[in-house]
Regions:
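Conserved hydrophobic beta-strands of the Rossmann-like cofactor-binding core
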Residues: 3-7, 11
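C-terminal helical subdomain
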Residues: 106-114, 118-159
Length: 159
């Protein structure tokens, strides 16, 4: 009947890390397709149900990797590009949908104890703790007018 909150949490990372190793361009397009365009497509599909909802929150698991302002990485180009594209796309949707009562949230969960990024023993958080912190962020009362990228540690990441 209705959907009040949509959480985009799908994400993949590519296998080629360094430009000197030769990029896998079809793989890069796949990463962009899943990480950025996937959220746009799912949002579009759910809008009729969300229009009838009350909270109208669209929440995205993003990453500090999508921050141009704080970029420190030397590799993982496709992942970084895909998260920057997700953030930019959601900024446009936020501008468009705000007048219809929607709120969009971007969230960086930190390095989670999963196999997505390799050696999971060194990660900051386990998936359960990361999910708890994400939900806290999504339900937190927000006073900012602009869309921001919240981090698991309570900071706001410039992007």
């Amino acid at each position: 009947e209705t959907v009040d909150m949509l959480i985009h949490c799908a994400g993949i990372n590519g296998t080629i890390r360094d430009i000197r190793d030769g990029y896998d361009y079809p793989g890069m397009l796949r990463t962009l397709n899943v990480n950025a365009l996937g959220a746009i497509r799912v949002t579009e599909a759910f809008l009729p149900l969300m229009d009838r909802g009350t909270d109208k929150k669209i929440c995205c698991i993003s990453s500090e990797a999508g921050s141009i302002g704080t970029c420190w990485r030397e590799d993982e180009t496709e992942y970084c590009m895909s998260k920057a594209a997700l953030n930019a796309g959601m900024a446009v949707l936020s501008n468009r949908l705000k007048k219809d009562g929607y709120e969009i949230r971007l969230y960086h969960p930190g390095w989670m104890n999963t196999y997505m990024m390799g050696t999971k023993e060194d990660a900051d958080l386990n998936p359960e703790e990361a999910a708890r912190l994400a939900l806290q962020s999504f339900f937190k009362i927000r006073e900012q007018e602009k869309l921001v990228l919240d981090s698991y540690d309570g900071s706001i990441i410039p992007w």
